[in-house]
């Protein structure tokens, strides 16, 4: 890192990774600053696109908390209210990124057409099984505009503990009592904690009581 900064006279370094401890971020920042460059992290507000449709974002403080299951639960509630729901999934692109700019999945044939990986299929298939359309890809402005054409409500199905790519009318953040305290010590999970309109403590049927209490207290 230091060699690249010095060899190329780099002036700014932007941290573009997620689900890492705050200590990790500041260690990287210290190395960058000592090498002579500015260090930055991206603002939530300035990186979010605005939809013309109501949008619900499902995020978390850590990866593996249960975002996708929650997205499917919320989508069923909205469907029962008579709303047309389209999910937009956090990107997992591999291969030819230009060809994957905007992907629409409504059937299993669409998954084959786009040569989805096993990881991608695991995320998309439950939505399809429940009768919902899923968008994903690379160009999230294009994806949003296409999704708006066939949705009354859009659901952001987040990945890792990344911030939503879109400005949400309702921002949901999941907390994990099996990893109590991480909601205050992981980036950008704590950003999601602070942005949330609604906090959900997941896995309460299996978590220790002290973990649940700590998460709620935090």
Positions of the model-derived regions?
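Flexible phosphate-sensing "switch/lid" loops adjacent to ATP/NTP-binding sites
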Residues: 2-8, 57-59, 76-218
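Short, acidic/small-residue loops that bind anionic groups at enzyme active sites
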Residues: 33-49, 177-184
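Hydrophobic positions on the alpha1 helix immediately C-terminal to the Walker A/P-loop
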Residues: 69-70, 74
């Amino acid at each position: 890192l230091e060699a690249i900064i010095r060899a190329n006279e780099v002036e700014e370094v932007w941290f573009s990774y997620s689900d890492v401890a705050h200590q990790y971020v500041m260690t990287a920042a210290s190395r960058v600053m000592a090498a002579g460059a500015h260090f930055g992290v991206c603002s939530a507000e300035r990186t979010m696109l605005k939809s013309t449709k109501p949008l619900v974002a499902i995020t978390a403080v850590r990866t593996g908390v249960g975002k996708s299951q929650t997205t499917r639960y919320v989508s069923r509630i909205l469907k029962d209210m008579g709303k047309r729901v389209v999910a937009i999934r956090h990107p997992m692109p591999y291969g030819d990124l230009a060809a994957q700019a905007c992907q629409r999945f409504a059937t299993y044939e669409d998954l084959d057409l786009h040569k989805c990986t096993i990881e991608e299929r695991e995320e998309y298939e439950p939505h399809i099984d429940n009768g919902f359309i899923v968008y994903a890809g690379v160009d999230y402005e294009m994806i949003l505009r296409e999704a708006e054409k066939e949705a009354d409500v859009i659901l952001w199905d987040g990945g890792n503990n990344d911030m939503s790519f879109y400005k949400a009318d309702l921002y949901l953040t999941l907390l994990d009592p099996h990893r109590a305290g991480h909601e205050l010590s992981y980036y950008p999970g704590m950003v999601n904690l602070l942005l949330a309109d609604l906090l959900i403590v997941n896995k309460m049927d299996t978590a220790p009581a002290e973990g649940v209490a700590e998460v709620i207290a935090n």
